[in-house]
Amino acid sequence: MYDALSNFCDAIRAAGLEPPDAIEPGRLHRFPGNGKRPSNRAGWCLLFDDGRGGCFGDWSTGITETWQAKRDKPYSRAERADFARRVEEAKKRAEAERNARQADAAKRATAIWNAANPAPGNHPYLIRKRIQPHGARIHKGALTLPVTDFTDRLTSLQFIAADGGKLLLSGGRKRGCFIPVAGDKENPGRVIICEGWATGCTLAEDEPTALVLAAIDAGNLEPVAVSVRRCWPSVELVIAGDDDRLIPGNPEATKAKAAAIAASAQLALPQWPEGSPQSLTDFNDLAQWIKEVSHG
């Protein structure tokens, strides 16, 4: 069984995930998704009781993989059929747990959102970013932002502290969901999708007639963009990406480009004026820097 467990963990690592320290056969385990903080539980795995196979995945990226132990004797048709059946059962089990956690998170999000008051315009984060509240609320001193799907269902919340620290409500559905920043979702003529909420506020204030959606992070740009294209096939769609020029490979801009290609959208990246600091990365940074320069 040790070899099976070791090989199963190797398969999980090969998919870009770090498996939990202890895996008990027959039990569904949860662990952080790819690149997520230690408290995250988007990753999951289940090793079958006999150690001959298992499956795993990452709900934050949408991947699902299977693993089957190698042996000298080929698996029979009946064994292959049994393996396929057990994989489907494991996937359904993981899906049921995810749905239950997301339903619970949605209830908690609704309760917090309904009890929260409108955010004051003098919140330190708003002042530092030079943006308006745009419907944000306040909960325990943090800006509270709704995360919704395309049916307007509240799925989670994002909290932004005075110092800019960000946190998503645990267990909530994020993939394919977004923070509605501004604009009319009934019949939009132009949709702009960006990563962060502050960037979205800057874009909304610059283009007040556009529907602006914040995808929360670069990895969620493509799922949101594809859904926008599905909802409004002929809409003018713009992916306003971040430009992390100092990071090798510029992953944020790369993901923005991939989202634009997948959704047949325009790609917009900040155009940096001569002399602007290389530490600037997004449209909010650009807008703030221009204001500072213009005011001396």
Predicted regions and their residues:
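Non-catalytic accessory segments of DNA primases and related replication-initiation nucleases
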Residues: 1-124, 244, 251
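TOPRIM fold recognition
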Residues: 1-6, 189, 205-296
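Short glycine-/small-residue-rich flexible loop motifs, especially phosphate/cofactor-binding loops
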Residues: 9, 123-126, 200, 257
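Short aromatic/hydrophobic-glycine micro-motifs
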Residues: 14-17, 131, 265
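Nucleic-acid enzyme cleavage-core boundary/entry regions
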Residues: 20, 38, 96-143, 148-163, ...
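Short, solvent-exposed polar/charged micro-motifs at secondary-structure junctions
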Residues: 28-39, 144-146, 277-285
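Phosphate-handling DNA/RNA-contact segment within nucleic-acid enzymes
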Residues: 104, 142-233
